[in-house]
Each structure stands twice: as structure tokens, then as C-alpha cells.
Curated annotation (Swiss-Prot):
Keyword Zinc appears in the UniProt entry: no
Protein family membership: Belongs to the MTUS1 family.
Biased composition range(s): Polar residues: 417-432
Nucleotidyltransferase found in the keyword field: no
Protein's name in the database: Microtubule-associated tumor suppressor 1 homolog A
GO molecular function, one term: microtubule binding
Protein's cellular compartments: Mitochondrion; Golgi apparatus; Cell membrane; Nucleus
Bilayer-crossing regions: none
SUPFAM superfamilies given in the database record: Apolipoprotein A-I
Described function: May inhibit cell proliferation.
Disordered: annotated segments: 44-67, 407-440
Taxonomic source organism: Danio rerio
Superkingdom, natural source: Eukaryota
Length: 440
């Protein structure tokens, strides 16, 4: 239907374009006729203007020359206008001819498309007929296949019933064979497991005895070495403490003696300086009195007095400077003694700290001995626990074997009926052998 409607629309379009072309041709023919008439009139006017007729009846021309010139100009203007219209018409004619040629080309193209569409329509109608024939044949084949399917289903149901009956018989036979096979295997495995359990029990008891003996020997060795170390540390501490104490006492005595000697020397020096100072003061007073007397005697010699006074002051300053230097030296010696005393105090503090460190080491050794005793108790408890765990594991292994036997009897379909099963021997399997107990 879509192709038919498309073809009808194309036909209508072709008809409309053809009608338009006919109208254009009619207009063009009318324009050509009008142009022909105008050209004929123009030629006639030109011939008339070129060949003027003689006056009829032999009468002279009564029109003045001015009116003749005006008529000529008027005709010239008319001719120019007609020429312009003719040119315009020629241009329109050329454009219309071009349009006509284009429309003719379009019409040819449309006719070619129309022919192609008609060919496609014929091909599609032929394909539709073939598809209908194929649909009819496929319907017949589908009915035939449905019939064959029903026949095969009935045959399959019969075969399935036979196979199910055969499978039930095979399962019953397999269950009986498995019961007999696993009963014999269970007896073999149980006997081997019992032998392996007895061996493991004997090995465990032997290992426990060896571990206990080793532990006792190690405990005795540790206790003896610990006691020896503690005694040696005590002796070293006492000897070092005595030596430090004696050296400290000697140094304190020496320091006290040096302090006493320095104090005595300093006190003697101070007394000597005091006596010297008193004697110098007395000398200075005597000198001042003497100079006062001399000044009274010789008031005119004031400059001499001043010079003598300056010299005496210089002597006194030199003496005072010497005394100050000596006192500085003594103070430096006292500072050195004080620093030495401070160093000795620091040595004493270090010795006391070392004494405390030795006491702390002794405490740590005592704590270590207590820790070793507690660890020994913990090891004994762990050995007891491991023996209990081994017993519990043996019980669990027996229970698992019993469950395995009962489970195999209850579900025989999951196991193949082949008698050559790859069963591990209980001596090589890791399920029946318990690992050796290692001390922590």
C-alpha cells in the first residue's frame, strides 16, 4: 500500500508539472507572436519613414518642417521603447527556455524513477507470493514435527520406566555389597587403630618421663647456677663496696687535713697581713707627722711636700697591689679545694648509685628465681593438660571412626562399589598418629 500511494503521488506531481509546462509554452508562444507583430510594425514604420509616399492627387505637402521633426523624434522614442521591450522579452524567453530544459530533465528523471519503482513493485509482489508458499510448506512441516515429537515422548517414557527399575535393582545390590565390604574394612581399621593407639600411648608415657627427667635436671642446674651467681655478685658487691668506702674515707681524711692546713696557713697569712698593715699605718702616721713638721718649718717648699706625698702614695699603692695579688692567689687555691671537694661528693654519689644498682640486680635475680619456679609449675600443668588433650583426641578419633562407619552404612549411594579403595594404613596416616609433645 505504501508503494502504491507513493506511485500515485508521483503521478499527480508529474501531471501538475506537465500542466505547468504547457501553460508556460502557451505564454511563450503568445509572447513570440506579440514580438513578431511588434517587429512587423516597426519594419513598416521604418519603410514608411525611409520611403515617403508622394502626395496623392498631386497636391503639395502642407505639413510644416517643425512638425515633421517632432514626429520623427516621437517615432524614435517609440522605437527605442519597443526595442527595450523586445530585449526584455528576449531575455525572458531565454530564461524560460532554460527553465523548460530543466523541467524536461526533471521529467525524464521522474519517469526513470517511476519505471524503477514499478520494477520493484513487481519484484515485491513475486517475493510475497513465494513467501506465502513457503509459509504453507513450513506449517505442514511443523505439524509433521509435532507428531514425531509425541511419538518420541511416548517411547522415551517407556524407556525411562525400564531404566528406573534397573537403577533400583542396582542400588539394592550395591547397598548389600557395601555393607559387607565396610563391615570387614571397619574391623581391620579398628584393630589397626587400637594397635596404633597403644603404641602412641607408650610413646607418650616415655616422652613424658624423659621430659620430666630433663626438666628436673635443668631445674637443678638453674638453681645451682643461680645460687652461685648470687653468691658471686654478693661477694663482688661487698668487696667493691668496702674498697670504695675505704678510698672514700681516705680521701675525706686527706681533704679534711688539707682543709685544716689551708685554714691554718690562711689564718697565719691573715695575721701577718694584719700586723704588716698596722705597721704600715704606724709608719704612714709617722711619715705624715714628720712631713707636717717639715711643712710647718718650710712653708715655702710646698711643691717639695707634694712630690714627697706622691712618692709615698705610690709606695703605698704598690704595697697594696702586692697584697691584693697574694689574696687573689689564696682565693684561687680555696676555689680549687672547693671544686675538689665537689668532685669527691660526686664520686660518693656515684658509689651510692652503684650500690643501689647492685641491690636492684640482686632483686632481679631473686625475681628471676621466683619466675623460674613458677614456670616450672606452669610446665607441669601444661604437661598434665597435654596428656588430657591427647586422651580427649583419642576419644574423639574413636567417635569419628564410629560416626564414619555409621554414616557410610546410612548413605551408600555416595560411594562407588569398587573394592580396590585407596585406604591409608593407620601407621602412615596422620589421623591416628599423635604429634610428640614438645616442652615450651
Amino acid at each position: 500500500m505504501f508503494f502504491i500511494s507513493k506511485l500515485s503521488l508521483s503521478n499527480i506531481h508529474v501531471r501538475l508539472t506537465a500542466k505547468g509546462l504547457l501553460r508556460n509554452l502557451q505564454l511563450l508562444s503568445g509572447c513570440k507572436l506579440a514580438v513578431g507583430f511588434l517587429a512587423v510594425d516597426k519594419n513598416k514604420s521604418r519603410t514608411n519613414s525611409k520611403n515617403p509616399q508622394p502626395p496623392t492627387n498631386g497636391q503639395p505637402d502642407l505639413v510644416p518642417p517643425e512638425s515633421k521633426s517632432r514626429n520623427v523624434e516621437y517615432y524614435k522614442a517609440q522605437c527605442e521603447k519597443k526595442n527595450q521591450t523586445i530585449r526584455q522579452l528576449e531575455n525572458t524567453l531565454l530564461s524560460n527556455n532554460r527553465r523548460f530544459e530543466a523541467v524536461a530533465v526533471v521529467i525524464k528523471h521522474l519517469y526513470a524513477e517511476h519505471d524503477e519503482v514499478m520494477k520493484q513493485r513487481r519484484d515485491l509482489s513475486q517475493e510475497l507470493v513465494t513467501l506465502r508458499e513457503e509459509l504453507v510448506s513450513s506449517g505442514h512441516s511443523c505439524e509433521r514435527l509435532e507428531q514425531e515429537k509425541e511419538d518420541l515422548r511416548s517411547a522415551f517414557d517407556g524407556v525411562l520406566q525400564k531404566v528406573q527399575e534397573q537403577h533400583r535393582l542396582d542400588l539394592a545390590d550395591l547397598e548389600e555389597r557395601l555393607k559387607t565390604f565396610y563391615s570387614t574394612e571397619w574391623e581391620k581399621v579398628h584393630q589397626a587403630y587400637q594397635e596404633e593407639a597403644d603404641k602412641c600411648k607408650a610413646q607418650m608415657e616415655q616422652q613424658l618421663e624423659e621430659i620430666r627427667s630433663k626438666h628436673e635436671a635443668l631445674k637443678k642446674e638453674l638453681e645451682s647456677s643461680h645460687i652461685e651467681e648470687v653468691d658471686g655478685l654478693k661477694q663482688q658487691f661487698e668487696e667493691s663496696f668496702k674498697g670504695f668506702k675505704q678510698s672514700h674515707e681516705k680521701e675525706m681524711q686527706n681533704l679534711n687535713e688539707t682543709l685544716k692546713e689551708s685554714e691554718e696557713t690562711l689564718s697565719n697569712q691573715i695575721q701577718d697581713l694584719m700586723t704588716e698593715n698596722d705597721s704600715l699605718k704606724e709608719k704612714l702616721n709617722a711619715e705624715v707627722k714628720r712631713r707636717m713638721e717639715l711643712a710647718e718649718k718650710t712653708q715655702d717648699s710646698h711643691t717639695l711636700y707634694l712630690e714627697q706625698e706622691l712618692e709615698s702614695l705610690k709606695v703605698v699603692l704598690d704595697i697594696k697591689n702586692k697584697q691584693i695579688h697574694e689574696q687573689d692567689k689564696k682565693l684561687m687555691q680555696i676555689d680549687k679545694l672547693m671544686e675538689r671537694n665537689v668532685k669527691l661528693d660526686e664520686c660518693l654519689k656515684k658509689l651510692q648509685q652503684e650500690n643501689e644498682d647492685l641491690k636492684a640486680r640482686m632483686d632481679r635475680h631473686a625475681a628471676l628465681s621466683r619466675q623460674l619456679s613458677t614456670e616450672q609449675a606452669v610446665l607441669q600443668e601444661s604437661l598434665q593438660k597435654e596428656s588430657k588433650v591427647n586422651k580427649r583426641l583419642s576419644m574423639e578419633n574413636e567417635e569419628l571412626l564410629w560416626k564414619l562407619h555409621n554414616g557410610d552404612l546410612n548413605s551408600p549411594r555416595k560411594i562407588s562399589p569398587s573394592p580396590s579403595l585407596n585406604l591409608q594404613s593407620p601407621r602412615t596416616s596422620g589421623m591416628f598418629s599423635s604429634p610428640p609433645v614438645s616442652p615450651r
